[in-house]
């Protein structure tokens, strides 16, 4: 029974990772969005060729928006960060 649960967990993790990666467009500029919160996030700066910090307002924006620099690197510049 534990093996079945482990396999199901692995499959769900893979499916979630694949679906997250599909909607990311690393060519978009950073986009704060319309809200007024102050969240430090990371975006891939295509001109600079690296992930950089920006302030996210908490809503809207675009898919070039990551919680960590590591997440940004994995999605947009694997092997370079």
Curated annotation (Swiss-Prot):
Residues 26-76 form the BPTI/Kunitz inhibitor domain. The record marks 36-37 as: Reactive bond for serine proteases. GO terms for biological process: envenomation resulting in negative regulation of voltage-gated potassium channel activity in another organism; venom-mediated suppression of fibrinolysis in another organism. Expressed by the venom gland. InterPro entries: Kunitz_BPTI, Kunitz_BPTI_sf, Prtase_inh_Kunz-CS, TFPI/VKTCI-like. SUPFAM superfamilies: BPTI-like. Disulfide bonds join 26-76, 35-59, 51-72, 73-81. PANTHER family: KUNITZ-TYPE PROTEASE INHIBITOR-RELATED (PTHR10083), TISSUE FACTOR PATHWAY INHIBITOR (PTHR10083:SF328). This is Kunitz-type serine protease inhibitor BmKTT-2. It comes from Olivierus martensii (Manchurian scorpion).
